[in-house]
Regions:
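Short secondary-structure transition/capping segments
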Residues: 149-151, 185-187, 371
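Solvent-exposed, well-ordered amphipathic alpha-helical segments
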Residues: 135-143, 186, 190, 289
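Beta1-alpha1 glycine-rich phosphate/pyrophosphate-binding loop at the start
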Residues: 30-42, 47-50, 82-86, 115-178
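Ferredoxin-type iron-sulfur electron-transfer modules and their immediate structural context
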Residues: 1-107, 112, 164, 189-353, ...
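A structured beta-alpha segment of the ubiquitous adenosine-cofactor-binding alpha/beta core
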Residues: 167-188, 287-290
Length: 393
């Protein structure tokens, strides 16, 4: 296969442009911090809160209990201090005016799910399934919901947040009831999630390596602190397992893809100007202005070495993947009803210096791709022309 024909596969397998930034990769919720950055820097705390809420489920609880591993993973951590995500998240919760969750007017799905354990993991799973109108029943051995997390903050504030996020949802709750017979539970429900906590019973379940949170028992899933991790990882598991349960209820399959771990980004602090971390004037929390000043330190980490080094890519202000799409349309005009001349100028402008390959961490040769594209144009009945650099702009 020629380099031209194989280039799409090369981009998919090697290009790091779409790799998550270090902070997002370290976050148990995979929070879209770059998306939040766009909202924070404009002072759009309502929009930021909605993104935060949709990702973590219980914003007030997470902002107070999360250890924020993203701060240590931040590119600036070893330079002048990582972005203060903890303070920014708490500022989001404090300054957002519209906090009510979305109310979904959906018909009942007619499927029943049992959740064994009323800690954060079980509550997170219940919230997501209730949002989609599944019938959920939570079994909790204690007389209150929340598990260990409830004791890590003011219980009144914890309960208030749970009530706020469930204000438009309904689920059954059996407090003070210990489940001892899992098979009896399976007979009454379409799916079961076991989230009994760090010291909880696992009912002898075996994990299934072919699906996230799946066990070898059909319809039974397991996660949360029972399988390791702190309360934030447990909550993230609960939110994610709801997708695995829904897949099972719809298809009968227990093969939900595993969440991608880590990032392939490789960036250095060379050339980054120092900007000391913003310290709250009151010593505790940011004002809106302080929050906007702090997020301005964000580097919006992404692999853009080729775009920074190549005059051609800077001229067209497009990512390698977008450029590939436009070149493909040009040399395969039948893919669109239009005349397919989108990238003729782009193809003809490159002088094939090879700089893009030199600076790319994966040594992807975009210039060779454009050269092969130019050679392919006559075969596709497209004329390629040479455009000198001084005429390219």
């Amino acid at each position: 296969m020629s380099y031209l024909e194989d280039f799409e596969k090369t981009l998919a397998e090697k290009c790091h442009q779409n790799e998550p930034p270090f902070c997002q990769a370290a976050c148990p919720f995979r929070l879209d911090i770059k998306g939040l950055e766009e909202k924070w820097k404009k002072g759009r705390f309502n929009a930021a809160y909605r993104t935060y809420q949709n990702t973590v489920g219980f914003p007030d609880i997470v902002s107070k209990l999360c250890s924020h591993p993203c701060e240590k993973a931040c590119l600036r951590a070893k330079l002048d201090g990582g972005i203060a995500m903890g303070l920014l998240e708490r500022a989001t919760v404090e300054y957002a005016k519209r906090k009510a969750p979305n109310a979904y007017n959906l018909p009942s799905k007619g499927k029943r799910i049992a959740i064994v354990g009323g800690g954060l993991s079980g509550l997170g799973c219940a919230l997501r399934l209730c949002n989609k109108k599944y019938e959920v029943t939570v079994y909790e051995r204690e007389m209150v919901l929340g598990g260990q997390a409830r004791n890590q903050m003011d219980p009144a504030e914890f309960d208030a947040e749970i009530e706020a996020q469930f204000q438009f949802e309904k689920f059954s709750c059996h407090l003070g009831e210990t489940v001892t017979d899992l098979e009896a539970l399976r007979a009454d429900y379409d799916a079961v999630y076991v989230a009994t906590g760090a010291d909880g019973v696992d009912f002898g379940l075996e994990m299934d390596p072919d699906g996230a949170f799946a066990t070898r028992t059909p319809g039974v899933f397991i996660g949360g602190s029972l399988t390791g991790g702190d309360s934030m990882k447990a909550l993230a598991d609960g939110l994610a397992v709801s997708l695995a349960i829904e897949r099972y209820l719809k298809t009968g399959g227990m093969n939900e893809p595993f969440r991608k771990e880590g990032t392939l980004l490789k960036l250095q602090t060379n050339g980054i100007e120092r900007a000391d971390r913003v310290v709250p004037a009151n010593g505790e929390s940011y004002t809106e202005e302080e929050a906007m000043q702090e997020i301005a330190r964000c580097q919006k980490c992404s692999c853009d070495a080729c775009m920074r080094a190549c005059d051609l890519m800077r001229l067209h202000e497009k990512t390698p993947r977008r450029l590939y799409e436009e070149v493909y349309i040009t040399i395969h005009p039948g893919t669109l009803s239009r005349d397919g001349t989108w990238a003729t100028r782009l193809i003809s402008t490159c002088d094939h210096c090879g700089l893009c390959k030199e600076v790319c961490p994966q040594h992807i040769d975009f210039s060779q791709f454009l050269l092969d594209s130019m050679r392919a144009m006559p075969k596709k009945r497209r004329d390629a022309v040479a455009i000198p650099r001084f005429l390219a702009a």
